[in-house]
Amino acid sequence: MWCIVLFSLVAWVYAEPTMYGEILSPNYPQVYPNEVEKSWDIEVPAGYGIHLYFTHLDIELSENCSYDSVQIMSGGHEEGKLCGRRTNKNSNSPVVKEFHIPYSKLQVIFRSDFSNEERFTGFAAYYVAEDIDECTAFADAPCSHFCNNFLGGYFCSCPPEYFLHEDKKNCGVNCSGNVFTTMTGEVESPNYPSPYPESSRCDYQIQLEEGFRVVVTMRREDFDVEPADSEGHCPDSLLFVAGDQHFGPYCGNGFPGPLTIETQSSALNIIFQTDGSEQRKGWKFRYHGDPIPCPKEVTANSFWEPERAKYVFRDVVKITCVDGFEVVQGSVGSPSFYSTCQSNGKWSNSKLRCQPVDCGAPEPIQHGRVEDPESTLFGSITRYSCEMPYYSMECEGSEVYHCSGNGSWVNKVLGIEPPKCIAVCGTPSEPFRSTQRIFGGSIAKIENFPWQVFFSNPWAGGALIDEYWVLTAAHVVEGNDIPVMYVGSSSVVTSQLSNAQMLTAERVFIHPGWEVLDPSITRKNFDNDIALVRLRDPVKMGPKVAPICLPGTSSEYDPPENVLGLISGWGRTNVKSHVIKLRGAKLPVAPLSKCREMKGVNPGIDISSFVFTENMICAGNDKGVDSCDGDSGGAFAVQDPKENKPKFYVAGLVSWGPQCGTYGIYTRVKNYVDWIRKTMQEYSAPSVD
């Protein structure tokens, strides 16, 4: 058995890129063998196409060249498939079939089946590299704008103000980096209203002075950007970014956003992005700088000057706190402050607050107390009171104070002055009830005469009329500028005086009308026998120490005849020179003539030679009750005719008398009230050494 072995020849040929070449079927020009498949990979230098042409073609003919064929492939695409016999169509050219391939590579494949009824000689073909116009040879333009062909290739270029992307094919516009700093202006897309560039990103910035916000105004008809796709995404878009604020992205025919965009920033970024597809006319808008507003309310409980509906950058206002409120900076309070609307839309001094005025703790007072108020802020109330019953308010209605808007405690009567507690005058803690009418009077308690002052040298008396002042007779302190005085003791025994209040004189004021005589001359003129002693320290009042009232200046304080007055002291009695325990007595007022008619102890002294004036009061009787030596300067106390309750005023001061136990002369204090008050007022403050 003979086995016939058939073989097929399969060949693959590759060569370096060349500018031309020849391709021949197997055994050409002889009969090609059966069952052959051979391919040729043709490659010319990049940038060239291939011109392939056949000068001979003799291949078994079949439908669709399904038996034997020569096939031309380019990039997986069949450029042609040939079979049969071909002859040249032009006698001047040997070419029977040709192909112009715009690529630098192609493949030629020859196939034959297992038998041929005739002798076919195959094909002869040639190729040559030829320049192609890439700018027109392809359905898709290789360049987005300008295509430039050259031998073996091409390059893309762009219009002015455009640049070529890294792919060397697409153009973009260099539209980033533009910064607009004017207060008004217009911004538009590249080429507006001509189509904007594709595949671009434009970044613009509006940068205004701090304190001004960017406001954009757009007309709908000035906006035409490729519309959104079916999913709502914008292929081309315009976006505004101002800090944390984002407006957009916007796209479509006609601006879809608000026609006025008010940002809250002085800087606005405009981002315009396009893809590589559809381009439209783009957009334009205007902008301006609007001063950044500040909120109207800086702080509560205040009012502003000037009053405006709107406050903007650089506006300055004066903020004044309403009554009862103040601004506290450190430890200093002020009723107002200034604030400026700043570039960030906030007020300067915004941390300052109008807070209730704090009047602080009420001022303490002497001889009184003040309630601890629940609060010391504006509108709070506090009350003062005096140490009753020995002190009372100097002014009626001065007890209640309220914290006022100016930070002071204010009283309706006294204003900002604190109240003053003054000693209650003319009211003994124990009334003097003795009815004894004998020379020397009766023993008394100091509580009966709490105004009684004891002068130890000379032995005399005085009347306390104020915490700093003692009233006495001029002849008591004449030549004695620093008298030693005591109050608050019934007994003037040295051991008892240690429990009394010792008074230190600061200054002595003798009435200017008092006649100063040589001590060797017998005094017959006691007119103006009155003096004041200013104390260095205030006297503390109590049940044993209290002042007597001064008289008024009206005629009611001229005591009529037979009105009883009280006298007290440690003067001489009918049994001894001086007493050590306080004695008191009641004396009636008598006509001055009674004192003129009296005869003195010394028959050699003519009483009629003594001076009698209207500045004197005569009091006493012939029953042995009278003031005497050692009582000088003491008060002749009479009940105040204008008071319902017993209250005594100093009607007179013990001055002189012709004889103890009868009538005596008293200085009429009413006539000196003006001098007393003037002196006390002028020297009210203690002197400072």
Swiss-Prot record:
Cleavage, annotated site positions: R437, I438
Residue ranges of every copy of the CUB domain listed in the record: 16-130, 175-290
Binding-site list for Ca(2+) 1: E60, D68, D113
Gene: C1S
Record's protein name: Complement C1s subcomponent
Domain Peptidase S1: 438-681
Residue ranges of domain EGF-like in the record: 131-172
Secretion signal span: 1-15
UniProt entry keywords in alphabetical sequence: Calcium, Complement pathway, Disulfide bond, EGF-like domain, Glycoprotein, Hydrolase, Hydroxylation, Immunity, Innate immunity, Metal-binding, Protease, Repeat, Secreted, Serine protease, Signal, Sushi
Functional note: Component of the complement C1 complex, a multiprotein complex that initiates the classical pathway of the complement system, a cascade of proteins that leads to phagocytosis and breakdown of pathogens and signaling that strengthens the adaptive immune system. C1S is activated following association of the C1 complex with immunoglobulins (IgG or IgM) complexed with antigens to form antigen-antibody complexes on the surface of pathogens. C1S is cleaved and activated by C1R to generate C1s subcomponent heavy and light chains.
Disulfide bond is among the record's keywords: yes
Root EC class: hydrolase
Family: Belongs to the peptidase S1 family.
Binding sites annotated in the UniProt record for Ca(2+) 3: E226, D236, D275, Q279
Disulfide bonds: C65-C83, C135-C147, C143-C156, C158-C171, C175-C202, C234-C251, C294-C341, C321-C354, C359-C403, C386-C421, C425-C549, C595-C618, C628-C660
Subcellular location(s) of the protein: Secreted; Cell surface
Biological source species: Bos taurus (Bovine)
Tree of life domain: Eukaryota
Gene Ontology cellular component annotations, sorted alphabetically: extracellular space
Protein EC: 3.4.21.42
Glycosylation sites noted in the Swiss-Prot or TrEMBL record: N64, N174, N406
Post-translational modification: Cleaved and activated by C1R to generate Complement C1s subcomponent heavy and light chains. The iron and 2-oxoglutarate dependent 3-hydroxylation of aspartate and asparagine is (R) stereospecific within EGF domains.
GO molecular-function term, one example from the UniProt record: serine-type endopeptidase activity
Keyword Glycoprotein: yes
Domain Sushi: 292-356, 357-423
Subunit structure: Core component of the complement C1 complex, a calcium-dependent complex composed of 1 molecule of the C1Q subcomplex, 2 molecules of C1R and 2 molecules of C1S. The C1Q subcomplex is composed 18 subunits: 3 chains of C1QA, C1QB, and C1QC trimerize to form 6 collagen-like triple helices connected to six globular ligand-recognition modules.
